[in-house]
């Protein structure tokens, strides 16, 4: 048996000591991670106990989001002040899209909007839309034959609504209609503009996630995001799907663009043009599958 020299023995000891040092450091790091995790869970539980939404009729909703690592900060149960106007804008989208875009983009308070090349039906729809927007104090207008003379009175809240919230209102209408067409007996609740914060966050004034709509059924939740612009924001809805979707609960992105929903499978993206029928079909598939 070959003997090792004192120098070699010293080298072996140093190598073993280095390995032990690495293991000790890894164990210490793991203990720190476990300590941080335990602390986060403690904070989350304290916040859960203080959160009012676990003590109301929203307990089921609060439990769902807590299971995903979030607490409810706030939500809107009503349909919103401009719900009917949002439905109207979407109903005449062929003419309202261009008009609203022009209204938002105009740098002048007063401008002329020519409507001579649109159909009579579209002209009537645009006229009715202007009447309703005038009632909401968003604009004033007068007509000269087929031209609209517009005086913009848009405020910040109006711009926010016309830039996207109006399509959320239309979305809600289509979603609720699809549910009622699917079943007159099914119970559900709709929550608008749901604000969430991470359960272990100590910042009471900050929300980490905003959700357009959450539909609550007895045993599942469907979360809806509305994309009114041309940018798909793929990273956002992929992240949200991973956060909230599972076998029963779904995250659904509704877009103004027209496309084949199968393009984005397994993620659920539905064009608003066919949202009502697409969502009704999804309900039929999901609820039928749960019965077997």
Regions found by a protein language model. Give the residues of each.
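Intrinsically disordered, low-complexity Ser/Thr/Pro/Gly-rich regulatory segments
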Residues: 6, 15-292
